[in-house]
């Protein structure tokens, strides 16, 4: 898995002088595009979930890919990318079984993405919004259960929970791997710069 992460990192970000947060944003946007289109949509089709879930996933994947492409050209829409992911999860919650489904598990990779992509007060605010949003979804599910679709059977619920949690776990691991890869890259760049400066003094 680590080798795959490093290969993906080299493919999506050949630059060596981009800021750390830009590198993370670009790689994560590309990762979301691949996961949504290559993993989530095929899994949803196997589970027979409503077509609207695939529409949300496809839209998220395409726009994320566009954000990654635009970032290569100097436009880094980090906050819109984060907000788009959160809104997509909110929409999917109501049509993918609510608290009985696996949508809330996808808040964990989004939290990992938040930690890697933002810093300081912005990171704290984003994590707070993320937590409050998840609690609000649970409260709506409890107070107005008629607003949320439900699985047709226990088997459907089991399949959704199993595939959703495993996919979310793997995605979280990939996000953390990208964060660590970008951090090591930044450390190596700084060490090379320091060595060059030390050599110039000599």
What kind of feature is each model-predicted range?
Residues 1-19:
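Short, Lys/Arg-rich, polar N-terminal cytosolic tail immediately upstream
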Residues 23-100, 106-114, 128-135:
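Hydrophobic transmembrane alpha-helices and their membrane-interface boundaries in multi-pass
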Residues 172, 179-201:
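Amphipathic coiled-coil signal-transmission "stalk" helices
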């Amino acid at each position: 898995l680590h080798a795959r992460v490093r290969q993906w990192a080299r493919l999506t970000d050949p630059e060596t002088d981009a800021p750390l947060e830009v590198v993370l944003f670009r790689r994560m946007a590309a990762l979301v595009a691949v996961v949504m289109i290559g993993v989530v949509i095929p899994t949803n089709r196997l589970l027979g979930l409503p077509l609207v879930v695939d529409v949300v996933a496809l839209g998220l994947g395409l726009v994320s890919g566009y954000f990654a492409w635009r970032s290569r050209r100097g436009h880094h829409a980090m906050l819109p990318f984060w907000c788009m992911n959160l809104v997509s999860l909110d929409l999917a919650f109501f049509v993918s079984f609510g608290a009985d489904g696996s949508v809330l598990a996808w808040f964990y990779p989004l939290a990992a993405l938040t930690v890697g992509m933002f810093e300081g007060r912005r990171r704290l605010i984003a994590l707070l919004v993320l937590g409050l949003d998840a609690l609000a979804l649970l409260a709506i599910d409890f107070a107005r259960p008629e607003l949320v679709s439900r699985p047709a059977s226990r088997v459907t619920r089991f399949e959704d929970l199993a595939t959703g949690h495993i996919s979310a776990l793997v995605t979280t691991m990939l996000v953390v791997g990208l964060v660590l890869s970008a951090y090591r890259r930044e450390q190596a760049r700084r060490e090379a710069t320091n060595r060059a400066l030390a050599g110039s003094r000599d």
